[in-house]
Regions:
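Surface-exposed, interaction-prone regions used to assemble/regulate multi-protein complexes
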Residues: 1-166
Length: 166
């Protein structure tokens, strides 16, 4: 099954699983067209955790469930004309309380350091709609198990968002 939805609806779908998704692919297919495929995380309920030799750690791990990619629940996002994107190692990212975002794993930002930095990184006067107004661009964040992907684009990947369940 496959259907199109909005970035916010896809975010609610991922949020419902209460686990960060996994990044499967990130590539540029056509000129300035960014393709990102993520999949939901699934618990491995019968996984055995080996003993570490540390009783306190073993007790903690006994209450944990390993996660793995659920390739039956994929989300493909295609940004047709991005302005900037970056991939960060999630282990080294910091939370900025001054940023204004909505969403948990698929986020949109009203205010962010990346949006503030944008005029220093690109010529904002060349943005496709001909304006350098902040409303002409949006910051999207994709928070996966191991990466934080930030995309600034003039429009969201609405009609190119595909959710498939095998």
């Amino acid at each position: 099954m496959s259907h199109c939805t909005t970035f916010a609806e896809a975010g609610r779908l991922v949020d419902a699983g209460r686990r960060a998704p996994f990044l499967l692919t990130l590539c540029e297919e056509d000129e300035n067209e960014l393709h990102i495929t993520i999949c939901c995380a699934k618990a491995e309920p019968n996984a055995q955790t080996p003993s570490t030799g540390n009783a306190a750690l073993d007790d903690t791990l006994a209450h944990c469930t390993p996660l793995s990619p659920d390739e039956n629940a994929k989300i493909e996002l295609i940004f047709e004309n991005y302005l900037l994107y970056q991939v960060r190692n999630e282990s080294y990212c910091v939370f900025d309380a001054d940023e204004v975002r909505s969403g948990t794993y698929l986020c949109t930002f009203e205010r962010s350091q990346l949006l503030d930095y944008l005029p220093r990184a690109i010529d904002v006067h060349l943005i496709p709609d001909g304006t350098d107004a902040p409303a002409s661009r949006k910051h999207y964040g994709i928070y996966t198990q191991n990466q934080i992907i930030d995309i600034v684009a003039p429009s969201e990947p609405t009609r190119h968002l595909r959710i498939s369940y095998a």
